[in-house]
C-alpha cells in the first residue's frame, strides 16, 4: 500500500508553497495582523481563483469534487506559512451545507463559497 501523496497532490503542494512564499510571506502576514479584517481580500480572491476554496465542493455547485486529503495538502502548507485565511472554516461550512442543506440552499450558497464570494464560519455553542 502506498500512503504517500499522488503526483497531483504534490503539484498542488508546490503551488501552495509558491503562493505562500511569493504572495503571502511572513512580512505580509505581520502587516495583515494590524488590519481590522486580519487578511487581504485580494489574496482571498487569488486563493479562490487557484481553486482551493472549491476543492471539496461538488462540481454541480462550482466545486472541483476532490477529496479531503487534497484539502489537507493545502491546509498543511498554508499552516506552515502561518496563513490567516479561514480555508478550513470555509470547507467545513460548505461540507455542512452539502450534507444537511436543501437543494435550494446548496444551489444558493455552495457556488458562492467555491468562488470566494462569501466567507462562512462555524461556531459551536
Question: What would you call each of these model-derived segments?
Answer:
Residues 11-18:
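A non-catalytic, amphipathic alpha-helix used as a structural packing/dimerization or gating element
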Residues 1, 18-19:
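Short, flexible segments with low predicted structural confidence
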Residues 21-123:
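Glycine-rich flavin
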Residues 1-8:
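Intrinsic disorder at enzyme termini
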Amino acid at each position: 500500500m502506498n500512503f504517500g501523496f499522488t503526483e497531483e497532490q504534490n503539484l498542488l503542494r508546490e503551488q501552495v508553497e509558491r503562493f505562500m512564499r511569493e504572495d503571502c510571506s511572513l512580512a505580509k502576514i505581520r502587516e495583515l495582523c494590524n488590519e481590522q479584517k486580519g487578511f487581504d481580500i485580494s489574496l482571498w480572491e487569488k486563493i479562490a481563483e487557484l481553486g482551493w476554496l472549491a476543492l471539496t465542493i461538488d462540481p454541480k455547485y462550482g466545486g472541483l469534487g476532490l477529496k479531503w486529503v487534497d484539502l489537507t495538502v493545502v491546509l498543511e502548507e498554508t499552516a506552515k506559512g502561518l496563513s490567516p485565511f479561514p480555508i478550513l472554516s470555509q470547507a467545513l461550512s460548505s461540507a455542512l451545507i452539502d450534507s444537511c442543506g436543501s437543494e435550494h440552499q446548496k444551489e444558493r450558497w455552495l457556488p458562492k463559497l467555491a468562488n470566494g464570494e462569501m466567507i462562512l464560519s462555524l461556531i459551536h455553542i
